[in-house]
């Protein structure tokens, strides 16, 4: 039986959930405060890393391999290339690298262990601690995030039973009745509602839930590599961990994109979403950190800097699914890692919205029971 689903949000979780619902024959309305896709969505950027290896976590590693396969299927569905399979390199202590490569193999992935010498020989344009090794994955790489979102919308526009409502902020959600009120007074009625608005979630959730979400602000540098290093960078995989104390990571320039640099040291907790400009302090901090990692790197490489926001569930530091009542849910926090798992998350959410038992995807926040806004411990707050 066809359901009427309202999806609030214009980022990757909202759009892929809409895709999954449409594929199942349901009627879907997507509404967002900005354009669709929303250029201020957490997921709107040049690129994101897709890697399988999650050290010492075989369950999540297996889930990431499934996500890899689903992204390949989505390229075929949308008839759009947005997944550059350049591999992924995770720099680790030698013992952890050996364990990681073995775990990936056991999970059905393809990876090899690199020694410190092999790492230095293969990537001379990276300065990695000489005592570290690495795991190099094959079934991994870079998702061209903006292209992903555009492909979702392009596909949805050609489907029956889909309505996209842009530039209409949502002021209230009544999950029990399936109604969503817009800023212009219009009320959308449906059988199920999903709120997936990333860092704006706190404004649409009960205070007791909103108070358990942490807002993060991350600074990012976008760079042009020197011409004499272009060949080396063209053969560089995505690097989710460079093995530094500060948690530095990078995305190589692929398909006309910039080299993206950032670090855990450039992520901080903030109270509100304000501007997106990178303060000179944070830019200099990142420039100094990467000056020790990339030979020859300096401010002249940097062509742009920006800040982005995301939310996490304070209790776990990860994502959060909230049951709003009726057939209403909120994917209220991404935890900073949701993009690569978005196809799996969308499948689980679509199942819940349309009355099916949710697919088990290997992610605890989605496989377990959601946080219930009507639970006594929340209702009493």
Predicted regions and their residues:
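Beta1/beta-strand and adjacent pyrophosphate-binding region of the FAD-binding site
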Residues: 1-13, 29
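Flavin (FAD/FMN) cofactor-binding and adjacent substrate-gating region
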Residues: 91-159, 163-166, 172-174, 313
